[in-house]
């Protein structure tokens, strides 16, 4: 049983099958299938959250599945850090060469997260770098420095690179154009009750 929280903080328990994924560069994502609780099945939306192993995750994608008499809902979720940093901007703009620490300090300023740098990095030259999401800037400067990071709670550890680039899951799910719920889940539930059907399977508006 997992408790999902809507954006007002109200909780809803549901039976869920989970698959977790931890990869290089801090990725902590979870995929799952919800099989019970009509309130969750019909209302789950981007930004809902749940806790797993003491860490908070945010829903970024959901898709209902017709299983005959029943409906299940598959979803993807990412650690709160990725969600928060994608939805928060850093308005500072950099031009020229700066120490790695200067970039990191500005990216994390007033973010609610703190960082620990456990590796050395050379100065990095950037032009017109800034005025973007914290996540975009953070990923770019980490890549430029040749480092990696891991996330636990509200703490981000920046370490020497030992793995490879971000996984497909993170690259896909943090394209802002793809951060959407695939279908209108409420309408899907209505359809299953026999009250209507999609006119266009690819257009559920």
Regions found by a protein language model. Give the residues of each.
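Amphipathic, non-transmembrane alpha-helical segments in extracytoplasmic/periplasmic proteins
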Residues: 32, 77, 90-115, 128-153, ...
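Surface-exposed cap/loop segments at beta↔alpha junctions
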Residues: 35-115
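Juxtamembrane "anchor/assembly" segments of surface/extracellular structural proteins
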Residues: 1-43, 80-82
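Envelope-exposed proteins and targeting segments
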Residues: 28, 55, 71-73, 154, ...
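Short, charged/polar, Gly/Pro-enriched secondary-structure boundary elements
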Residues: 80-88, 163-172
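Acidic, small/polar-enriched beta strand-loop surface segments
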Residues: 166-205
């Amino acid at each position: 049983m997992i408790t999902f929280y809507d954006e007002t903080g109200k909780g809803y328990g549901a039976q869920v099958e989970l698959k977790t994924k931890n990869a290089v560069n801090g990725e902590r994502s979870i995929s799952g299938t919800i099989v019970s609780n009509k309130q969750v099945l019909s209302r789950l939306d981007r930004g809902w959250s749940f806790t797993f192993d003491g860490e908070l995750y945010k829903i970024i994608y959901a898709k209902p599945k017709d299983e005959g008499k029943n409906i299940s809902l598959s979803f993807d979720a990412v650690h709160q850090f990725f969600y928060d940093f994608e939805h928060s901007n850093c308005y500072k703009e950099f031009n020229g060469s700066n120490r790695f620490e200067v970039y990191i300090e500005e990216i994390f300023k007033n973010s609610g997260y703190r960082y620990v740098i456990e590796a050395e990095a050379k100065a990095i030259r950037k032009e017109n770098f800034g005025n973007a999401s914290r996540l975009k800037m953070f990923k770019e400067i980490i890549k430029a420095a040749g480092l990696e990071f891991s996330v636990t709670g509200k703490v981000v550890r920046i370490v020497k690179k030992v793995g490879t680039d971000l996984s497909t899951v993170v690259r896909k799910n943090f394209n802002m154009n793809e951060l959407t719920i695939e279908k209108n889940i409420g309408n899907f539930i209505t359809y299953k009750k026999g009250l209507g059907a999609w006119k266009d399977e690819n257009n559920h508006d």
